[in-house]
Design a protein with these regions (language model features):
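Short beta-strand element of the alpha/beta-hydrolase
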Residues: 51-59
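Active-site/substrate-binding loop(s) of hydrolase catalytic cores
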Residues: 49, 63-210, 279
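Conserved hydrophobic/aromatic pocket- or pore-lining residues that grip, position, or stack substrates
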Residues: 37, 57, 103
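Short glycine/proline-enriched loop/turn "hinge" motifs that connect secondary-structure elements
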Residues: 44-46, 140-143, 268-274
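A generic structural signal for alpha->beta connector loops
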Residues: 23-25, 39, 98-100, 147, ...
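C-terminal accessory segments enriched in acidic
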Residues: 1-9, 14, 18, 22, ...
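General small-molecule cofactor/ligand-binding pocket signal
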Residues: 29, 102-104, 245
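Soluble metallo-hydrolase cores and metallopeptidase-like ectodomains found primarily
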Residues: 3-52
Length: 319
């Protein structure tokens, strides 16, 4: 069966081609480059003055989320051009002309390629040799070409240095994201990953009203997945669905967390913008590959979430 996961080059040119095909309302932009000089692409969809960020694959082991975000961007662009409603409810053109989407499907291109093809894909000989000396199997490697965990590299409260040579925002990929967050600010961040099937919202260096807004939007998104889950459970007989989880920005040293948040992009974005930042984990294990049919089904599960976020934000459901 045909596998869905695409190479970095194919993902990059898929975004570039979308911008060319739908040039009146889609823009392609390179926001920076990795340490091994792979460009980090971003696609802007819609004409809204403000933006909602959709971020994928800071962890190189996240091999599915880039494909989902690119596939989702293709569906949005086609629906926008044709004036279609998604799920017979979401008016794509109306929503994206209020808040446009900034889709960054592959924030760690070096780690993504390492996980697929091994350390030999790293062109810089010094980085390549350093990575091989770590004796970590390439399929278990989620860091960038310098061996740094990008999801722990943002300058948040409670940031902790975990190895020599690492400081807050020391990595090119993180610097690129920080620049675009600061330039656009935006109305929110949805960060997509694999692993657990859940939606995370954050507490910490924000006031109670902002925490309430984050929880309310996260709950709205969960309810959207619940409605789709009920239909799928009725069809398959299996229990499905996302659960909601609160995360503190600072996790005590004696407390374990499945997603340690100090240095993570979501609390950083929340701190600099005072806007909600949610992490959506799609419930697929690292190393799992999907067929095109499975990718399409997984995309249908989450494609309404950015739209529901914009709808909730612009319709007064969250104030």
């Amino acid at each position: 069966m045909e596998k869905a996961s695409d190479t970095y080059e194919k993902l990059y040119y898929s975004l570039w081609e979308l911008a060319g095909r739908y040039s009146s309302f889609v823009q392609f932009r390179v926001i920076g480059s990795s340490h091994d000089e792979r460009m980090i692409p971003m696609l802007e969809i819609g004409k809204g003055r403000n933006v909602l960020f959709c971020l994928g694959s800071l962890d190189g082991r996240d091999q599915i989320t880039p494909d989902i975000l690119v596939y989702m961007a293709e569906e949005y662009a086609k629906a926008y051009e044709c004036g279609w409603l998604l799920e017979d409810f979401y008016d794509i053109r109306k929503l994206l002309d209020q808040i446009r989407l900034c889709v960054i499907p592959l924030a760690n291109p070096d780690g993504y390629e390492i996980c697929r093809y091994g350390f030999s894909v790293i062109r810089n000989p010094i980085y390549r040799q350093m990575l091989k000396m770590q004796q970590i199997p390439c399929e278990e490697f989620g860091c960038n070409a310098r061996g740094m965990d990008l999801s722990r590299n943002f300058p948040t409260s409670g940031y902790k240095r975990t190895r020599a040579g690492q400081g807050p925002a020391s990595e090119n990929e993180v610097k690129a994201l920080i620049r675009i967050f600061q330039e656009y600010q935006g109305e929110g961040l949805l960060s997509f990953g694999q692993a657990w099937q859940r939606i995370l919202y954050y507490t910490g260096d924000i006031n109670g009203r902002q925490i309430y807004k984050s929880h309310k939007i996260a709950r709205n998104l969960q309810q959207c997945t619940d409605r789709r889950r009920v239909k799928k459970e009725q069809a398959s007989g299996l229990k499905m669905g996302y659960h909601l989880e609160k995360q503190s920005v600072i996790v005590p040293e004696n407390k374990e967390s499945r997603y340690f948040t100090a240095g993570a992009p979501e609390p950083f974005y929340q701190q600099i913008t005072a806007r909600p930042a949610l992490r959506i984990e799609i419930g697929k294990t690292w190393g799992q590959e999907l067929t095109r049919e499975e990718l399409s089904e997984c995309t249908r599960d989450i494609r309404i979430l950015p739209l529901e976020y914009i709808f909730s934000y612009t319709s007064g459901l969250v104030s």
